[in-house]
């Protein structure tokens, strides 16, 4: 059994309250006082108190902006080239912070055999993976995999690849790092999908160290043992969550039907995930549900007949950080490990995240 031996997270410097973000968005999404009031009500009911960004502009005055133009209408609006330049500058420090905390007192950087980098908010070649190798002086012969444009479920997919590697290559030490700078892709498009996306998404990074079971035992690493993965695509939701390139950045489509699609599919996903394991809902101690939004957590809680305490970590991450896309489920797993897990007990954790497709990706973990 492969083991997630360590999880660490990192946040950018600028913390914005949800009301401050709502004020900023209202300036560009609402052309009347009535629309501004409606938008602020949406923000107040989002379940989010604060979000982090690599950009200070969302709670600063017009003259203090550093990313957007100091104009009343943000023109000339940032191009995709400018946004990618900003990503390349700001993403690496977050990755390094998360990685250094993750591997500290676990392994030396020179011992890492595989690097899996994850992002859907920045792309370039040579890319983030090579920047990490260079900065940390990793072995130039390290095996590298980049997982791009999968969205919020990509961390679980990356853990799946790490698990495959550990099972196939004795001695493998796999580092997974996810970083998303969602806030550099703010768009002024005045439609509900875009308004909801701007209300939810934030910036952050997370790293996970995955090793084969024998290495974990030899080094007395405690962590999450990986039991199983299961993925399911709800093709009737293919157009309800999309992420596409444009001349002014990445465009998010996030329809209001997503909670309904998840509500209809989550029971079957859970049932199929448990096949061959003889596990029931009552056997799961901890629930690492990706907090894609308050409504998503509510429908999952209802459909799986969970108590509010079962999703405590998911709600806490949503409240304090918002939806950071791929790193978010790792934030939830870290919160569970730090605050809820009793490491000496054989507790089970069920994790699930959602993304374009509509894809639902799940993972079953056991304390080791």
PLM region spans:
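Condensing-enzyme catalytic core mediating Claisen C-C bond formation in acyl metabolism
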Residues: 1-86, 173, 186-264, 268, ...
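Claisen-condensing/thiolase-fold acyl-transfer catalytic domains that form or cleave C-C bonds
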Residues: 120-121, 139-141, 146-167, 263, ...
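Active-site glycine-rich loop that binds ribose-phosphate moieties when present
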Residues: 140-142, 147, 157-161, 178-198, ...
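Glycine/charged-rich beta-loop-alpha catalytic/anionic-binding loops adjacent to active sites
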Residues: 78, 110-114, 136-148, 188-193, ...
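Conserved beta-ketoacyl condensing-enzyme motif
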Residues: 42, 46-138, 281-297
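Short, well-ordered amphipathic alpha-helical segments that serve as non-catalytic structural scaffolds
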Residues: 48, 90-104, 161, 205, ...
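Acidic-glycine-rich active-site phosphate/pyrophosphate-binding loop
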Residues: 123-138, 176-187, 238-243, 297-311
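Phosphate/pyrophosphate-binding loops at sites that engage ATP/ADP/AMP, CoA/4′-phosphopantetheine
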Residues: 98-112, 218, 267-285, 304, ...
């Amino acid at each position: 059994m492969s083991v997630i031996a360590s999880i660490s997270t990192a946040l950018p410097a600028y913390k914005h309250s949800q009301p401050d973000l709502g004020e900023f968005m209202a300036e560009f999404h609402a052309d009347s006082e009535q629309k501004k009031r409606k938008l602020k009500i949406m923000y107040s009911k989002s379940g989010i108190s604060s979000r982090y960004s690599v950009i200070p502009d969302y709670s600063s005055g017009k003259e203090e902006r550093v990313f957007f133009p100091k104009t009343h209408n943000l023109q000339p609006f940032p191009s995709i080239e400018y946004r990618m330049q900003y990503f390349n500058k700001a993403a690496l420090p977050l990755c390094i912070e998360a990685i250094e905390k993750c591997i500290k007192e676990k392994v030396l950087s020179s011992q890492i055999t595989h690097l899996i980098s994850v992002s859907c908010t920045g792309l370039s070649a040579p890319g983030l993976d090579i920047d990490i190798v260079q900065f940390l002086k990793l072995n130039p012969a390290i095996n590298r995999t980049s997982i791009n444009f999968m969205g919020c479920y990509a961390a679980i997919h990356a853990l799946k690849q790490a698990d495959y590697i550990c099972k196939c290559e004795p001695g493998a030490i796999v580092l997974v790092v996810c970083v998303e700078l969602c806030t550099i892709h703010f768009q002024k498009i005045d439609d509900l999908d875009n308004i909801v996306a701007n209300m939810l998404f934030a910036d952050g990074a997370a790293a996970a160290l995955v090793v084969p079971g024998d290495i974990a035992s030899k080094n007395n690493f405690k962590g999450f043992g990986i039991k199983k993965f299961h993925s399911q695509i709800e093709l009737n939701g293919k157009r309800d969550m999309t992420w596409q390139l444009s001349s002014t950045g990445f465009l998010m489509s996030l329809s209001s039907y997503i909670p309904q699609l998840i509500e209809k599919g989550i029971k079957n996903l859970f049932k199929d995930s448990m096949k061959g394991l003889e596990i029931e809902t009552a056997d799961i101690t901890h629930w690492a549900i990706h907090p894609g939004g308050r409504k998503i957590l509510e429908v999952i809680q209802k459909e799986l007949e969970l108590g509010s305490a079962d999703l405590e970590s998911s709600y806490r991450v949503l409240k304090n950080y918002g939806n950071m896309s791929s790193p978010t489920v790792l934030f939830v797993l870290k919160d569970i490990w730090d605050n809820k897990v009793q490491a000496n007990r054989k507790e089970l954790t069920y994790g699930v995240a959602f993304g374009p497709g509509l894809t639902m990706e799940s993972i079953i973990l056991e304390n080791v």
